[in-house]
Structures are given as C-alpha cells and as structure tokens.
C-alpha cells in the first residue's frame, strides 16, 4: 500500500495558536532544566551552533536560517539538554514537525531571522550562567514572539492555514 503509515495532520489557525501556547510552556521548562543540567561542553556546542547560524544568516541576507534547520537544531539541543526524556519526546514528536512546517513558511519574514538569533543568544547566555529562571522567561518570550508573528501573518492574509 503506497503511503501506508503516513498521516497528514492539518490544524486550524486557532489550533495552531493553541499549540504555540503549549510549546511556550514546554520549551520554557526545557530551557530551565537545560540551564540546570547541560554540561559545559553542551553549552559550548550550543554557542558554536549560534555562531554558525549567524554566518548562515549573513551569507543569505537572513533568509537561510530556518531553511538549513538552524532553528530546529537550537531547540532540539535544548530539549535534549534538559535531560527530561518525556519532555524532549513531546517537544520533538509529530506535533513539533507540524509546527516547524509553519515556521519554515514564515522564515522569510523581514528581520525575523536576525531577531530570532538575538533571542537565541540571550537564552544561551542565561543557560551558560545557570540561570534557569531567566532561561525559562526568555524562551517563553521567544516562542510568544513567534506565535504573534504567525498570528499577524494569518490576519494579513500572508499565511493560509
């Protein structure tokens, strides 16, 4: 049977916004736990990843950040670094891929890749300082900014769900 086991999941705009609100809390928790549990080497690797992302943005005038899975890599490393297996499974499962699909379609938003990189750097600084509370706050604000960006795109008709 062709496509056996392949499931296509679609969501309404309101469901997508609900998923972002759930992600905001879950990714905030992942960032808090990453600050408490990541090794120094993992944090150094995360910082190096952002340096690579910055070069990619510069080379592509900001358009390649998500296309090269840079954003996914950042969030994946933090989810894994939280050492919370269930949380990481939830964040990196089917729903996460669906959310990524919409994020990818929005990655060409003017200035968003540069802003996202700055937000990522501040999150990593908080993790490196082992400040779980600040890392959680910054991650939640980062996901909330992404949600607001998507909401605006839907309202302006630039993104159809």
Which stretches of residues belong to each language-model region?
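Short helix-capping and inter-helix turn/linker motifs at the boundaries of alpha-helical repeat units
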Residues: 44, 111-114
């Amino acid at each position: 049977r062709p496509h056996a086991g392949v499931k296509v999941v679609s969501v309404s705009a309101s469901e997508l916004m609900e998923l972002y609100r759930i992600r905001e809390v879950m990714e905030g928790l992942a960032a808090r736990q990453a600050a408490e549990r990541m090794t120094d080497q993992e944090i150094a690797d995360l910082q190096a990843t952002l340096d690579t992302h910055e070069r990619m943005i510069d080379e592509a005038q900001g358009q390649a950040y998500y296309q090269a899975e840079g954003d996914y890599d950042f969030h994946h490393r933090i989810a894994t670094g939280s050492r919370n297996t269930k949380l990481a499974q939830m964040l990196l499962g089917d729903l996460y891929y669906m959310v990524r699909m919409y994020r990818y379609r929005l990655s060409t938003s003017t200035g968003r890749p540069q802003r996202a990189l700055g937000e990522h750097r501040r999150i990593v600084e908080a993790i490196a300082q082992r400040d779980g509370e600040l890392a959680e706050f910054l991650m939640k604000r980062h996901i909330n900014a992404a949600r607001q960006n998507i909401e605006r795109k839907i309202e302006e008709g630039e993104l159809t769900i």
